[in-house]
Amino acid sequence: MWTILLTILIAGLLYRYVKRHYTHWQRLGVDEEPAKIPFGVMDTVMKQERSLGMALADIYARHEGKIVGIYMLNKRSILIRDAQLARQIMTSDFASFHDRGVYVDEDKDPLSANLFNLRGASWRNLRQKLTPSFSSGKIKGMFGTIDDVGDKLVQHLEGALDQSDEVEIKDVMTTYAVDIIGSVIFGLEIDSFRNPKNEFREISSSTSRDESLLLKIHNMSMFICPPIAKLMNRLGYESRILTSLRDMMKRTIEFREEHNVVRKDMLQLLIRLRNTGKIGEDDDQVWDMETAQEQLKSMSIEKIAAQAFLFYVAGSESTAAASAFTLYELSMYPELLKEAQEEVDAVLMKHNLKPKDRFTYEAVQDLKFLDICIMETIRKYPGLPFLNRECTEDYPVPGTNHIIAKGTPILISLFGMQRDPVYFPNPNGYDPHRFDSNNMNYDQAAYMPFGEGPRHCIALRMGKVNSKVAVAKILANFDLVQSPRKEVEFRFDAAPVLVTKEPLKLRLTKRK
């Protein structure tokens, strides 16, 4: 009898505790997204119906206030819906939100210690060291390598069109982007268009092929529940992809140092940072090989590999998506396609270049309309559909009576905000001219596809150049066949990116 009563009492107390936990925001008077216990707002993600980015966009669309209280599993979090507040959090109030709150374990898992994950002083010191790597002078120095991959892209498409006039443009752009990363970041001589079975491509392809449950749990817990990711690593979980790329990078670094091999790429700059503690100015000497005794090196191979893997994950997906979606949208808007193609032709003529010539950094910088096309693409299809921060000290929300407590995860739905008609007229259309300097008919606070403030994307300049080269090379050498207008739908993916449900197919013809 007493056992039954005790069980009922414990069950009642547990129910009351759980109910109280999942109505926390409601009791504070904060607009709240109802929780599906025990998943919170993650039920569609856990059922693999929606990606995390699209699930957050769904919540964004269902509410109207500045902030929405949500539950990521059992973690009390805040979704920011107000563009001005979101920008303020990442810029002027950065001191209260200087970390992302994702998994990192510098001591036991140095491969997790990348610029995206790091916290506090560790992040600040590394950011200062890496920032010179992405100056316009450094990118100009690496441009020849980027352009070489662009030429291989054109050659591949010319061969593919001999078989069919239809191509899966996202797949093609992914190969292009991965080869740039392999060449510029990892210092490899590769051509995945001709040799898709090369070691780097095989390793990188396994990131999308690996459907193991452990990988999905680890990937999602890095964002949603870092202690689970930390526990998995302490128990021996290790990313085969990361360790394979680390070993590949180690061999390349050792070969370069042993044989005094110098190449104008990001790896050369990372080697210099490892050996000297700094990267240096935009001059020819920055590419020189400088070595140091192992005990004097400022960064381990693991930490170098962690940064390279971050650049791979962020750079390959964002470049592939931006270039593929730009071409896809232009194919549906013939007047914009004509304008873009005519600009490419005019700029090539201005710089005395033919479509098959090596492009120059200066010519690509002159493609101003293509700039705003890519700006509109990454508004509509942000490479990372949400931004995340962690509240690092209690923060009074401006214009409200609410206080965000220290330790609370903060989420900003870029997909939701950048498709909100409050901020962008006709948000589901494709209108590059909204970014014309004499137009600007949108709320500039709401546009932040690369993040904002001190933790904005460090490689945004290189990402834009990579995408522009791909699109410009294709427009210079091929005509896009007009496609019927159709909205893209997205499917579940454990990684925090946009993955289309259906292939992005385009029809091309060779230009006469």
Swiss-Prot record:
Q: Which residues bind heme?
A: 457
Q: What are the BP-aspect GO terms?
A: response to camptothecin
Q: Any idea which UniProt keywords this protein has?
A: Endoplasmic reticulum, Heme, Iron, Membrane, Metal-binding, Microsome, Monooxygenase, Oxidoreductase
Q: Give a Gene Ontology cellular component term annotated to this protein.
A: endoplasmic reticulum membrane
Topology with respect to the bilayer = Peripheral membrane protein
Iron keyword on record: yes
What does the record give as EC number?
Answer: 1.14.-.-
Please give the Gene Ontology molecular function terms for this protein.
heme binding; iron ion binding; monooxygenase activity; oxidoreductase activity, acting on paired donors, with incorporation or reduction of molecular oxygen
Enzyme class, one word? oxidoreductase
Report the domain of life of the source organism. Eukaryota
Q: Where in the cell is it found?
A: Endoplasmic reticulum membrane; Microsome membrane
Q: Which Gene3D superfamilies match?
A: Cytochrome P450 (1.10.630.10)
Any Pfam family the entry gives: p450
Give the protein's cofactors.
Answer: heme
InterPro entries recorded for this chain? Cyt_P450, Cyt_P450_CS, Cyt_P450_E_grp-I, Cyt_P450_sf, Insect_CytP450_Detox
Can you tell me which family this protein belongs to?
Answer: Belongs to the cytochrome P450 family.
| Purpose | May be involved in the metabolism of insect hormones and in the breakdown of synthetic insecticides.
The protein's name: Probable cytochrome P450 6d2
Organism field? Drosophila melanogaster
Q: What gene name is given for the protein in this entry?
A: Cyp6d2
